[in-house]
């Protein structure tokens, strides 16, 4: 596992944030189940830059410099999650691997687009705080989960990338 701060230049990072997080016209889809248990009330909004079926978003070009920085050879999936601030206590989703059927080694990156008190938690107890322009890179088979944020901005933005 590797944690890297200031992943992108300020200009490149702000360009991504302005076109996605700060853009009222950026398209989001409501996902009510995801890795949660159906009916548990947990949900998030998602924009898929590259879906598991290979469909590419017209906004995928925004991430070109990030893909180059990561050394992406094959992009399996890339999605941005928008999570809404919760009251008083963190909400956790179940521990999961992003792909259980992928038969090749792959890397997962969680890239944080804003700073808040949400975080990524790993099954071994490691906690990585949501800090803007920070990423955590790890083996794709590593189980992890997210903790909602309870302070700061109304929304938490996280980019999730799976590649080899």
Segments the model singles out, each with a brief description of its role:
Residues 1-74:
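Non-heme Fe(II)/2-oxoglutarate
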Residues 68-89:
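A short glycine-rich, His/Asp/Glu-containing loop-to-beta-strand
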Residues 82-84, 113, 163:
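Short beta-strand segments enriched in hydrophobic/aromatic residues
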Residues 88-95, 104-106, 112-131:
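A short beta-strand-loop-beta hairpin characteristic of the jelly-roll/cupin
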Residues 90, 128-145:
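Conserved metal-binding segment of the jelly-roll/cupin
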Residues 94-96, 143-151:
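Short beta-strand His + acidic residue motifs that chelate non-heme Fe in jelly-roll/DSBH
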Residues 109-111, 152-164:
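A short hydrophobic beta-strand segment most commonly corresponding to one strand
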């Amino acid at each position: 596992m590797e944690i890297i701060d200031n992943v992108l230049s300020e200009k490149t990072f702000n360009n991504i944030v302005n076109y996605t997080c700060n853009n009222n016209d950026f398209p989001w889809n409501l996902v009510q189940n995801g890795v949660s248990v159906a009916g548990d009330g947990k949900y998030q909004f998602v924009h898929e830059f590259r879906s598991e079926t290979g469909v590419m978003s017209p906004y995928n070009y925004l991430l070109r410099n990030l893909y180059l920085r990561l050394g992406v050879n094959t992009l399996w999936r890339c999605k941005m999650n928008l999570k809404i601030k919760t009251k008083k206590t963190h909400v956790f989703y179940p521990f999961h691997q992003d792909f259980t059927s992928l038969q090749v080694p792959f890397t997962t990156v969680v890239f944080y687009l804003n700073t808040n008190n949400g975080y990524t938690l790993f099954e071994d107890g490691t906690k990585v705080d949501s800090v803007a322009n920070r990423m955590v890179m790890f083996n794709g088979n590593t189980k992890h989960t997210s903790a909602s944020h309870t302070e700061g901005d109304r929304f938490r933005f996280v980019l999730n990338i799976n590649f080899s």
